[in-house]
Amino acid sequence: MGDDVRVTWRRVRESWARSAAIELPLAVPAQPPAPGCLRVAFLVYRGNPQCGGQGVYTRHLTRELVAMGHSVTVFAGQPWPQLDPGVGFVPLPGLDLYRDPDPFRIPHPRELHDLAAAVELGVMLTAGFGEPLAFSMRARRVLRSRRGQFDLVHDNQCLGTGMLGILGDGWPLLTTLHHPITVDRQLALGHATTPWQRATTRRWFGFLRMQTRVARRLPAIVTVSRSSATDIAAQMGVAPERMTVVPVGVDHTVFRPQPDVAAVPGRLMVTSSSDVPMKGLVPLLEALSLLRADRDVELVVVGKPREGGRVDRAIERLGLRDVVRCVSGISDEELARCYAQAQVAIVPSLYEGFSLPAIEAMACGVPVVATTGGALPEVVGRSGETGVLVPPNDPLALARAIAGLLDDPAARARLGAAGRDRVLDRFTWQVTAMGTAACYRALLDTGPPEGGRGVRGGRHRPQVAPCATDRSLVTSAAKGAPC
């Protein structure tokens, strides 16, 4: 017992030392807006693109908005975002309680300098996730000190209670809701095997009550697929007329075919930003085990499965250590090269609100095998034409689809080319930015938020058409805007 206490205390002190050594990034001023363009405060509570789709969305959308002439300042918590030149940045540091190498750390008392920090720690100590609430409190406080500096606020799925305060302070607020996290909770509960796991899972997802309550009161929501819009309305009770579908995109100058890079025979690739049941890695590993019975295959996992977690245990149980390789922390250019070296890319998710990995692979000209979970059919397209679709959580169907492509070079080439054409036609960040900017204009044309005090700063805003919900309308609305 005494040894355990000493070890714990040593780890706490080591964590404190690491915290003391961390230097906060400097704020970066935003590029001023072009005439007639907007000043946007963009909020993201977790901004690093290597931690998930929210960070990728933040980086590429803000870059394209700035290219259109808008001025964008990103207010972000840890892990910090990667931003392009011209995009402003204001760090809103939290306690970063889940960082490597000391997740669920106990912060030094000096770090508890405000109510938001106390809330963040208190929620973690009761097995919950307090980052969205704490970040929304910090964001509201900072925006109160910047009245008149922005025309609107864009929240990237924080949905903390502080967002209602931001609305009440008079800020026009647009929110991106990628998909309802209620789906994540349902899948996590379905994979919990003990009463304790079910109890802790419910507690961890306790923030969903707050997000649902906030979402129902938001004036304007952007979501990324028709599937997500349907699920948000059904599971969170958001009025459909408040939602607009603007798909996300891919940087097709980075994610492109590389004819000088040879695909490795039998190599498969999957990208997974988190080690959770929803990503479907265990069914994919079971499919890989079936494929090994009559062929040489290997799987590259772009992600970091948790040591001793479900994926790690499945690799061990199925005897796949020698054919599964995990890589993480790589650049977009390195990721594109990984796609080029694969014969088939797989998206085995049980559910996706969109799927950046699917369109990244398609943009690279790599044939995709995906499930029908969530928005994947909407993204990948018709099975057999621009990709191959199979039921979710079906290892045998996955194995058969993958084997069919591995055995048919002509089909791989045909689907790869058709997939890239589909992405270039529908899913680029330029289209995403134009559609988002059209939604900004529509929001501002509605006047100050109900109960707000009007802090926009008096800038003239030309009129535009209402937000569109498909690519052709999004493009035409954006082209009609002066920016």
How would you name each of these model-derived features?
Residues 102-126, 167-212:
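Acceptor-binding helix/loop patch of EC 2.4 sugar-transfer enzymes
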Residues 227, 249:
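Carbohydrate-associated surface elements
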Residues 350:
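Aromatic "clamp/platform" in nucleotide-sugar-dependent glycosyltransferases that forms part
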